[in-house]
Amino acid sequence: MTVQTIRDFLKLESASGLLLIGAMLLAVLCANTPLSWLYDGFLQTRFEIHFGALSLAKPLLLWINDGLMAIFFLLVGLEVKREILEGELSSLPQIALPGIAAVGGMLVPALIYTGINWSAPATLQGWAIPAATDIAFALGVIALLGKNVPGPLKLFLLTLAILDDLGAIVIIALFYTADLSVLSLVLAMIAVAGLFILNRTGVTHIAAYVLLGVFLWICVLKSGVHATLAGVVLAFAIPLRTKDQDGHSLLRHLEHTLHPWVAYGILPIFAFANAGVSLAGISFTDVFSPLPLGIAAGLFVGKQFGIVVFSWIGVKLRMARLPQGVSWGEFHGMAVLCGIGFTMSLFIATLALDGSQETADAARLGVLLGSLMSALSGYYLLKRAVRKRALRAEAP
C-alpha cells in the first residue's frame, strides 16, 4: 500500500467516521421523539423483488442488513485479499503484532461477555457482539486529534481492523448460520465454481462477476447461511494481478469505486437503521442487566485489556515489536478506541440474538454505551499521549 493510498484511505475513513456519529445521533433522536412512529414504520416497510417465479419480500431493515451489508463485506473481502497478496498481511513480521492484538481483542471481550451472561442462556449466544471494531468510527475520533497522531499507529490500526473484520467473517460463517437448504447450497457452490473459473481464465469484465455474484447472493440468502458472506466469496474471486485492456487491476478498480459508496452511503444508512434505541423507561438498573452490561464491559474493558496485554506479552517474548516511534501510552489510547464496536457490533447483534424489540434495544444500549465510553476515553488517552510526544520534541 503506497503512502498516498494510505493517506487517501485514512481521509475517507475519518470523514466516514464523523458521518457515522451524525447518523447514530439522528437515529437516537428519531427513536426518542414523536418521529419514532415514522422511523419504525419506515424501517418495517416491506419491499418485494420478483425474478420470474422467485420472490424476495423483506422489510427495509432486512434489505439493509442482508443486502447493503453484503456490499460492505465485498469491500472488506477485496481489502483482505489485496493485503494478503501484496500488503500488510503478506509477511509474518508485518502481521505478527496486529495478529496477536486481534486475537486478544476478540478473545477477552468474548470471555467477559460470556462470564457476565453465563446465567442467561437466552443471551449467551451474543458472545461475539463485543469482539468487533468499527474502523471508520475509530478513525473518525482520531481525525479530531489532527495530524499529531503517528502515521505508523494509524497503519497498525488499519491492519488490526482488517484482521478483526476477517475474524468477524469467520465467526458469522461458523456460529451464526441457520438451518440449511441443501438445494440452495448446491446452487451457491455452482455459482462459486463459476466465479473462480472466470478468475482462472483471466476474465476482466466486471459485469460477468456481478451477475454471478447476485445469483450467489440469492442462493446464499435462501440457504440459511448469512447472505453477507456472498460478498466475501465474490471478493476472493475478483482478480488482483490480471489486468484489463486499459492495464488496470480489476480488484483495485472495484475497491476504489466501492470505497466512497460504502463509507459515505452504506455504513451511515446501516448505522441510522440499527442505532435507534428508545431510552424511554430505561432505568439505571437496566444498564446493569447481563446483556447490555456484557456488551459494554466487553467493548470498553475487554478490548483494551486484550489488545494491550496480548501485545505486551508478544513484545516481551520478542515475537513482535511496537510500530516504529510509537509509545505504549499512544498504543494504549489506540487500543481503547478499538472498543468502538458500533456498526459491526450492531450487525452481529442482529444475527446472534432473538428478534424481540426488548432484546434488540438492550443490545443497542450496550453497544452504544461501550462504544461511547471507548470513544471518549480513547480520545482523552491518545490526546494526552500525543501532547507528551510534542512536549518531548520541544524540549532542549
Swiss-Prot record:
Places the protein is found: Cell inner membrane
One Pfam assignment: Na_H_antiport_1
GO cellular component, one term: plasma membrane
A molecular-function term among this protein's GO annotations: sodium:proton antiporter activity
InterPro entries (UniProt xref): Na/H_antiporter_dom_sf (IPR023171), NhaA (IPR004670)
Reaction catalysis annotation: Na(+)(in) + 2 H(+)(out) = Na(+)(out) + 2 H(+)(in)
Keyword Lyase in annotation: no
Bridged cysteine pairs (disulfide): none
Keywords: Antiport, Cell inner membrane, Cell membrane, Ion transport, Membrane, Sodium, Sodium transport, Transmembrane, Transmembrane helix, Transport
Membrane-crossing residue ranges in chain numbering: 18-38, 60-80, 95-115, 126-146, 155-175, 178-198, 201-221, 262-282, 295-315, 333-353, 362-382
GO term, biological process aspect, one: regulation of pH
Main location class: membrane
Annotated membrane topology: Multi-pass membrane protein
Protein purpose: Na(+)/H(+) antiporter that extrudes sodium in exchange for external protons.
HAMAP family listed in its UniProt record: NhaA
Family to which the UniProt record says this protein belongs: Belongs to the NhaA Na(+)/H(+) (TC 2.A.33) antiporter family.
Name under which the protein is recorded: Na(+)/H(+) antiporter NhaA 1
Species of provenance: Syntrophotalea carbinolica (strain DSM 2380 / NBRC 103641 / GraBd1)
